[in-house]
Amino acid sequence: MEIKNWYELTFEIETNLEEIIIWKLNELGISSYAFEILLNNKNNKKVIIWLPHLNWPESLRIKLVRNIKEVLDKNNYQTNCFEWNLIEQEDWISSWKKYWGPEIVGDNLLILPCWLELPEEYKNKKVIKIDPGAAFGTGSHPTTSLCLEELEKISLSSKKILDIGSGSGILSIAARSFGASKIYSIDNDYLAINSTESNFRLNFGNLDNLKTYLGSFDGLVSKYTLKNFDFILCNILAEVIKGIIPDIRNCLKIDGEVILSGILNSQKDEIIKLLKASNLRINDVSSKKDWVCITAQKIP
């Protein structure tokens, strides 16, 4: 179904609340948003959220504002200034494009919006082209960049990869760019699956090394034979990760590794405890801002 119109919600927050708002939006399954620095008040930022018109009736929009206000109230910030606008597809495209530019991640990766030319100074970078569509993961958020930086460290040549919560497909594309031979991508949102396939084709011209599955990870594991993976990439909410760690272990080959992101610092210890309880050895823990990425390995 083609999205024709979008609701645009704007409000202001203190700059230090950006990460907690991102976490809340991710928890609510909202992935089209941006933050804008205010020139007249550099201690605050404007939050812009875009929502597909047909999926967000008034009752859900009221509930969304209530959820955001609760988060802000808990962090000692009060506002009642929430502004809604209904915008057409063309206006939405021009709105979010202005927040995009080339994004360097790690040592060698460049995330490039598909409508931009590759700048001359980045010719030596490994380029991942992205058409974000409804913006399911771009590389700019710490959870995604942490995963990409971990992928740079390891040898993926001829490896079999599972990407749980593929979103825009950015991690699947990076894995293939680093030499993975077969990528299996899972998401429970059909728009994300479409985005994964579209962006994979944009980068490689075909889908020969990609297989996609629409549905929840635990449901797909029981339906299909998803086993013997060298690496599993999982950039989703920690609350979801907690419930699927045993299934993740079962999908890995012996000595296979999982890269987990989407974890707040405050959630790290609990996730590590659950990984160890499932006989997954912690190999690496990295952090950026309030977020943590954990790499763990299946041991006999």
Swiss-Prot record:
Known EC number? 2.1.1.-
One MF term in the entry's GO annotations: protein-lysine N-methyltransferase activity
Alphabetized, the UniProt keywords read: Cytoplasm, Methyltransferase, S-adenosyl-L-methionine, Transferase
Annotated positions binding S-adenosyl-L-methionine: T144, G165, D187, N235
Q: Which GO terms describe its cellular component?
A: cytoplasm
Location in the cell reads: Cytoplasm
Which SUPFAM superfamilies does UniProt cross-reference here?
S-adenosyl-L-methionine-dependent methyltransferases
Q: Which GO terms describe its biological process?
A: methylation
Q: What class of enzyme is it?
A: transferase
Q: Does the keyword Nuclease apply?
A: no
What is the residue range of the signal peptide feature?
A: none
Q: What InterPro entries has UniProt attached to this entry?
A: Ribosomal_L11_MeTrfase_PrmA, Ribosomal_PrmA_MeTrfase, SAM-dependent_MTases_sf
Protein function: Methylates ribosomal protein L11.
Similarity remark: Belongs to the methyltransferase superfamily. PrmA family.
What name has this protein been given in UniProt?
Ribosomal protein L11 methyltransferase
Task: Tell me the lineage of the source organism.
Answer: Bacteria, Bacillati, Cyanobacteriota, Cyanophyceae, Synechococcales
